Curated annotation (Swiss-Prot):
One of its GO terms (cellular component) is chloroplast. It comes from Pinus strobus. Belongs to the peroxiredoxin family. AhpC/Prx1 subfamily. It comes from the Eukaryota. Transmembrane segments: none annotated. Homodimer; disulfide-linked, upon oxidation. Thiol-specific peroxidase that catalyzes the reduction of hydrogen peroxide and organic hydroperoxides to water and alcohols, respectively. Plays a role in cell protection against oxidative stress by detoxifying peroxides. May be an antioxidant enzyme particularly in the developing shoot and photosynthesizing leaf. Keywords: Antioxidant, Chloroplast, Disulfide bond, Oxidoreductase, Peroxidase, Plastid, Redox-active center. One of its GO terms (molecular function) is thioredoxin-dependent peroxiredoxin activity. This is Putative 2-Cys peroxiredoxin BAS1. Its main location: plastid.
Amino acid sequence: GLFIIDKEGVIQHSTINNEGVIQHSTINNLAIGRFGVLLADQGLALRSIPNGPSAL
């Protein structure tokens, strides 16, 4: 799916759940949500982990 993440690390929209709201943390630039973990860098989703939070 497509994630649009702003420079503050907030996921603005997700085409996976169409809710546009996922729990996030700007610490370590991690966006953690229901569908796994995204590693964000300068507003870009570089990596997604489909099976939930895990050690990076």
